Curated annotation (Swiss-Prot):
Low complexity: bias regions: 221-231
Biased composition regions of type Polar residues, renumbered to the chain: 289-301
Zinc finger (RING-type): 760-800
Nucleus keyword on record: no
Entry EC number(s): 2.3.2.27
Record-given protein name: Putative E3 ubiquitin-protein ligase RF298
Gene3D superfamilies: Zinc/RING finger domain, C3HC4 (zinc finger)
Region of interest (Disordered), residue spans: 1-51, 221-301, 411-441
Metabolic or biological pathway, per its Swiss-Prot or TrEMBL entry: Protein modification; protein ubiquitination
Comment block on domains: The RING-type zinc finger domain mediates binding to an E2 ubiquitin-conjugating enzyme.
GO molecular function terms attached to this record: transferase activity; zinc ion binding
Amino acid sequence: MVEKQEEMNEFGAVNGGKVGTSSSVSPPQDKGRKNKRKLADPSPQNAASLTEFPRYELHSFKSQSPLCENDSNGQLKAEESDSVGWDDPFACHLEGLLSSNLLTLFRSAMNQIMDCGYSEDVVLKAISSSRFYCGGTDLVSNIVNDTLSFLKSGKKVAGSRDYVFEDLQQLVAYSLVEKISLVREVRPSLSTDEAMWRLLICDLNVLKAFEVDADGLEGSSVSNASKSSESPVAECNPPKSSDADNPKAPVSNTQSKQSEPVKFGNFANVNNSKNPHASGATPGKEVFSVSTASGEGTKSASLTSVSDEKLVSCRKGRTKKEMAMLRQKSCVEKIRTYSKGGGYKTAKFGGFLVEKRGKSASDLLSAQARNSSSKITTEVMKIPLAESSSTLSNSTKSDSPALDVKEHVTALPANNAPAPVASEKKSGSEPEEKPSVSTKPAPDYYAAIPYDATLGIYIPRNKRDELILKLVPRMKDLQKELQDWTDWANQKVKQATVRLLKDQPELKALRKEKEEAEEFRKEKQLLEENTIKRRSEMELALNNATNQLERTNNTIRRLELEQSLLKREREAANIRASESAESCREAKERVQRLLKNSQSWEGQKNLLQEELKSQRDKVAGLQQEVAKAKTRQNQIEATWKQEKSATGKLTAQAAALKKERGKLEELGKAEEERIKTKAENDVKYYIENIKRLDTEISKLKLKSDSLKIAALKKGIDGNNDGNKSGMNHTTNTKANSMASAKVWENNQGAESKIKRERECVMCLSEEMSVIFLPCAHQVLCSKCNQLHEKEAMEDCPSCRAKIQRRIQARFARG
């Protein structure tokens, strides 16, 4: 009680004191009820997750009757006790069925509205801004008509105060909670699962749920009162008595409190007028009024209007149970505020903060499980357990399931569920019997216990008798409760049977429609098969045409590509032709210049021949150096071989000899590479000079062929004289140079015998006899070819192509 008072005080303090102090003393609560839901958990670390609702205004109100306070206190008790009904498995099952039906209705209505040309978002916003659909026609027609009228009126749909739902599922969840709350406001004696059952059998029509015959549901309408008085630990609401036997049904509350058709997203407002009982005026507006005419027996229902202000902004992720508890607490707070003695001024809620911190569904379920387990522990601790008697342990084993059955009774138990009856074992050899419900008279459990006639009580002799005296009354209570549940289930079966009989004509019509639809489907299937066949033929023809068109396009693209390539080749050929013409013109000019300068070439020819001779001498010297280098290399290799053979004999000196050998090899290789590199560079240089000189000489010989032979003969003698006269500016010629010069002179003497075009390009004396492949050039004689191959020259002297094979050719002279 103190905790509840602190929650209400904190609630009023958070709202800034605009609603009043909200500190009226809460009515006494049932002390045995320890698992009540705690909505205000003062946890400062989670204060940022508060749920804030939009601002709204409450008009001036002044209570003049203490009856209002009594009604509000009774309603507070009923609402707090009904919070457990959402956790009932049967209620959860009904909730799933109602949610599925309501979602189907909303989607059907949205499809009809969307057929009129509206988008899905606009339709969803318009539906969330419409009324609660309590008209006389079906729910889908109400939604469609109200939403279309709202859309055609041109009101703004996207306002922050009108649209409070993020998706259709959230709209369905909140709508279901509103319908259940509205039914329970009109019928305060109904529990949550009973209100759900009424909505289910009435196709979610709130008016029909109000008008359902009370005789059909009288067994379940006062289950909360009988449950709280007889079995405080049970979590379900078994039917106990009728509405007339329930002294706690708040009848005056239904006459004094106003209920209006609520818009989606709104909680119903409480009474905003003075209490009709206090002022003496006849209540002109009731939550729901049912009048029975004597002659016609008709019933009329009317609902008052409600304010269009939004009281709550639905928050994503909040369960239906939490939304119902929020609504109940808001009603309690407003009733307390209205019941104050002084006047109530107009105020605005800065933020309707319900919980100090947001609790997830897992936290709520775990808290409830802890409360339920504490209740079970309390019940079990009241029963003394025997520790020494074997018969007592057998009784305890048979009695403990009875407690579990009591703590976990489902909303609609199965027919084969065992009843919580404690059975005894006569001996250890007899099998253990399961508790069952039977129509036979119950055995007398007190037969073995002595009875004191003077005191009128049974006197237990041991702990077993004490346990029997305690468990037999509980067994009777459970049997009575089981019988109530059986009657309740039979009543529900009767209601379902009546509902099924009402739906028989509709089922027949639906079967007929199904047969017609099946015939139409077969005809449509045959037509579709023919259409598919024609379509496949057309697609095949279209594919063939498309493939042919693609091939044509590919051919066109290929021809265009070839045309562009040919254009580029033609342009390149034109450029090459112009370049060739330019080169021919330049060659012609050079020939003319050479013809003019032919007289001066005679003097230069002698100088070139002398230079050629000196270059040949240098080549011979380099060849000798190369031979010496090879000899030295052979010597080094022989030395290395000797050292290698010596290493096998002298293992102790292997490391030193290896180092020395490595050094010698490095020096020899370095020297060899240096000599080879130098010789190759010199040979290449001399060969290039020789080729250049030969080219110039051949050009001169072509110009003056007749004078060339005479000049060559004279030139041999002149060379000897020139060599003698040239001793002034040259050093002494070595013996090998003189010998090579004599050989060259002899070759020059025999030069006239070989045709110029058949001379070797290196020695210019022998006839060309070696063919290089793959270039097929024949430029060297056999001797020069051997020298060329020994020097590791792999390029053709004529075209510089790679020589893959050398062929020795012989030609017969004719």
